[in-house]
Regions:
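Alpha-helical transmembrane segments of integral membrane proteins
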Residues: 1-22, 280-284, 313-350, 361-483, ...
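Small-residue-rich transmembrane alpha-helices
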Residues: 30, 34-37, 265, 346-412, ...
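Generic structural signal for small/hydrophobic residues in well-ordered secondary structure
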Residues: 11, 21, 42, 58, ...
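Membrane-proximal extracellular/periplasmic loop immediately following the first transmembrane helix
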Residues: 36-101, 216, 220-228, 241-243, ...
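Mid-to-C-terminal secondary-structure elements
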Residues: 123-136, 149-286, 488-671
Length: 801
């Protein structure tokens, strides 16, 4: 208790040092805590599943001359074949229905129409045997019958209201499938890649295969249809993977194709959320590289806060040297002094932890928004309290051990004469080293910020090869009734003054569509690479501003099926002149031959992480699920309202949904933009904490050099020369830190940029800019204390012992 009172008095007596110490630690602890919570949340995905470590997804890889493609899906008939091949395992399938509309019949005919962007699946009972769901009503066997649907509790309440039993009630899916509610499952946690809201029996889609890309053929592999396996405890996945190679050879060898080697393998459930090679049914994925980056930033920020504390504490120890000497003369031994100083450190850390909790609580909404985190963050949960206690103990030890050992080891005679500064208090070289480490970390973060922001700017301003501005994308149904209305709908859209062009299509030029197939060119055998597909009407080029390199667009008057290839396709076929491809023919899979009427200039069909793939654009009305509208930039809101009015007139049974193309493209880089923003925030925090560390070292130097400054002033030294004396040393330290930060930052940012096929080039400007920023901020930090020392009364300085 005595040590606690003494610690509190010292804390209150040295308000300036205490404020800086507590502030730096609080910011460091809060930042580290929030980052660790985010990382832990991402790592927790689907860990609530009972058989988490024994569940696998059966995925597909296909090797071609131009590389390997990965697909989260597997052919539909593989399910029964796998059950025969591996009777010891449990298999189940899940088929996604993205962006479907659920219609809930209401009294009076005013039906409720709800668009579910994610969460609608077709599932078989086997899936619910693998993944554990809490059934509030019904059982997995309910999904063995066609027309059966299971709802989550939250979804049932949204559709039918609270307190109403939904079992036995009717729904309609996309105005095509009549369904009866046969079961209710409890709500799943948000940290899952299987956000089941509506589960329709797989038997239902089997009877309506054309509606949801359900192709019961060994030649069709789609990430929409996925198969999962539950292996018995003790069963090694490696042995199963070896058998899957033989399984693939048996079932794929008869398929006519162009692959060099197609196979299946098991992907563990713990890897699914992080493996960016494959699609998931969740609304976002996080690569492990991102998690490692966030973890390192958290550790670095916390480490810098500890370094800052050490610097300030040792700087303060000079002013407390006489106190330590008196305590030793009065009988205190080194052990007692050590624990007193550690106690003071613990008190500071405790206050900092309380302040950190306040900062973290205020920052939670902002952090959740940045990282798109849906789960509620309970800062006072048992796990977080334990995490905070662990951080507090670690910080107390790391930040307190050196000052405690140093100050408790003062020679009492030297301390009473106030000559400790001559002994350098444990060596100023250590504190210089700590400042170098601080600024090396902060400069790494500054470089990372500059590079990430520059890459994001490059992406925003990159020439995509098509027009993405003021392009509105509508969703439309492809049922027979809606398809019959397409012509009249398009005609009315063109009458709207704000609409320049329209196109019915499967998807816009840039999308997450990965449709591809084997093909043959000019009556040759199948090529050894795949062609990617887009289906669109004749308005596609004008609506999206695509340019022809040769030939002409296909027209409705063409007597044979026709399409366009891109320049990447041209070059992979061994041609350089676009005109050479015009008039040639191309066959998709085992279908009919298509006339190539033109070559379109390359455009970026996906994220800039990927190179331009060989492309074939061809009309095919049954898959026109989107309508692209090029709008005049003036009066966009008015035009959108008129478009919605026309849509509702033609499709009253469907809810109107639309989005702008540029917003959809931005979603490709959502995680990268989040990372760039986090870099900005934590680079700023790192610089701030580093400047506090500088302030500590300058404070130490100002005390140590008090008499030297006085002598220099008496001998005629100017204020600027004294400021230069202080700044020179720190300039050298920062330059040294730059040469540590430079290679590390270059390595990490090169690795990050290598994920982008189209990227900026690292130049000296990024690194020199970071150095100049660090120097500028450091000089400002040093200047305050240096000027104060330079303008002090030299007479008082010369009296200093």
């Amino acid at each position: 208790m005595t040590n606690l009172k003494t610690g509190w008095r010292n804390l209150w007596r040295n308000k300036s040092f205490s404020f800086i110490n507590i502030t730096g630690l609080a910011i460091g602890i809060a930042a580290a805590m929030l980052l660790f919570i985010v990382v832990r949340y991402e790592l927790s995905y689907d860990t609530f599943q009972k058989n988490y470590n024994n569940i696998y997804r059966v995925v597909t890889s296909d090797r071609f001359e131009d590389g390997v493609t990965y697909n989260a899906g597997i052919p539909v008939p593989a399910l029964e074949a796998l059950r025969v091949k591996f009777p010891q395992a449990t298999f189940g399938s899940l088929h996604g229905a993205y962006g479907s509309q659920v219609t809930v019949p209401m009294p009076g005919g005013n039906d409720k129409k709800i668009i579910e962007k994610v969460g609608i699946f077709f599932a078989d009972p086997g899936f619910f045997s693998i993944f554990n769901f809490h059934w509030l009503s019904g059982s997995p066997e309910a999904l063995a019958q066609p027309g059966a649907v299971v709802l989550s509790k939250e979804t049932a309440e949204k559709y039918f209201g609270k307190g109403v039993s939904p079992v036995g009630k009717l729904l309609k899916l996309d105005n095509q499938l009549s369904l009866k509610v046969s079961g209710i499952i409890d709500n799943l946690p948000v940290n899952t890649d299987y956000p089941v809201k509506v589960a329709v029996s797989m038997e239902t889609v089997k009877r309506n295969p054309d509606l949801y890309n359900y192709n019961d053929d060994w030649g069709n592999t789609s990430s929409t249809h996925q198969i999962y396996a539950l292996l018995p405890a003790g069963q090694l996945p490696g042995a199963v993977n070896k058998q899957l190679i033989a399984f693939a050879e048996e079932h794929y060898k008869k398929r006519k194709g162009n692959g060099l080697g197609k196979t299946n393998f098991l992907q563990p459930l713990p890897d699914i959320h992080f493996d960016t090679r494959f699609e998931t049914f969740g609304d976002h994925r996080t690569g492990k590289t991102t998690l490692w980056t966030l973890s390192l930033i958290g550790v670095f920020i916390l480490l810098m806060a500890c370094i800052n504390f050490i610097n300030l504490s040792t700087a303060q120890s000079i002013t407390r040297s006489k106190e330590m000497g008196i305590r030793k003369v009065l009988g205190s031994n080194r052990r007692k002094l050590f624990w007193q100083i550690m106690g003071e450190t613990g008190l500071l850390v405790a206050v900092a932890v309380i302040l950190a909790l306040i900062i973290a609580r205020l920052s939670v909404p902002f952090v959740k928004h940045i990282v798109s985190m849906q789960e509620e963050i309970h800062l006072f949960s048992v796990t977080n309290i334990l995490l905070l206690a662990l951080i507090g103990l670690a910080v107390t030890f790391l930040a307190g051990i050196y000052p405690s050992l140093s100050m408790s080891g003062f020679n009492p005679i030297t301390a009473l004469k106030n000559k400790v500064m001559s002994a350098k208090v444990g060596g100023i070289s250590l504190r210089r080293g700590l400042v170098v480490l601080q600024f090396a970390i902060s400069q790494m973060l500054i470089i990372g910020t500059i590079v990430a922001v520059s890459q994001m700017d490059f992406i925003r301003n990159a020439d995509l090869g098509f027009n993405k501005d003021a392009v509105l994308m509508l969703n439309i149904s492809i049922d027979s009734s809606s398809m019959s209305k397409q012509y009249a709908f398009g005609k009315d859209l063109k009458k709207i003054p704000g609409v320049e062009n329209i196109s019915f299509t499967s998807d816009p030029p840039a999308s997450d569509n990965n449709w591809s197939t084997n093909f043959a060119f000019d009556h040759r055998p199948d090529e050894k690479f795949q062609v990617h597909l887009k289906f669109a009407d004749t308005g596609y080029l004008n609506t999206f501003g695509l340019q022809l390199a040769a030939g002409r667009n296909y027209e409705p008057s063409d007597t044979t099926r026709a399409g366009l290839i891109n320049e990447a396709m041209l070059h992979m076929l061994g041609m350089q002149d676009p005109a050479d491809a015009v008039g040639k023919t191309l066959r998709l899979g085992g279908g009919n031959w298509n006339l190539i009427t033109g070559v379109v200039k390359d455009f970026k069909a996906s994220s800039l992480r990927s190179e331009v793939k060989p492309m074939f654009i061809v009309p095919y009305k049954p898959v026109y699920e989107r309508v692209g509208l090029k709008l005049h930039s003036a009066n966009l809101a008015k035009t959108q309202a008129e478009v919605e009015k026309v849509y509702n007139a033609h499709f009253p049974e469907y809810a109107y949904t639309a989005s702008f193309l540029d917003e959809s493209i931005n979603e490709f880089y959502k995680q990268d933009s989040q990372l760039a923003l986090l870099y900005k925030i934590f680079a700023g925090l790192a610089v701030f904490i580093a400047c506090l560390g500088l302030y500590g070292l300058v404070s130490f130097m100002a005390v140590q050099k008090t008499k030297e400054v006085g002598i220099r002033k008496v001998l005629g030294a100017s204020v600027s020369s004294i400021v230069y004396m202080f700044s020179k040393e720190f300039t050298v330290l920062i330059v040294i830190s730059f040469f540590i930060a430079f290679p590390a930052a270059w390595y990490f940012m090169t690795a990050w940029l290598n994920d982008f096929h189209y990227r900026i080039q690292l130049s000296a400007g990024f690194f020199i800019g970071a150095l100049l920023i660090s120097l500028g901020i450091a000089w400002l930090s040093v200047a305050y204390k240096a000027i104060a020392a330079a303008v002090s009364n030299p007479v008082k300085a010369l009296r200093t012992e």
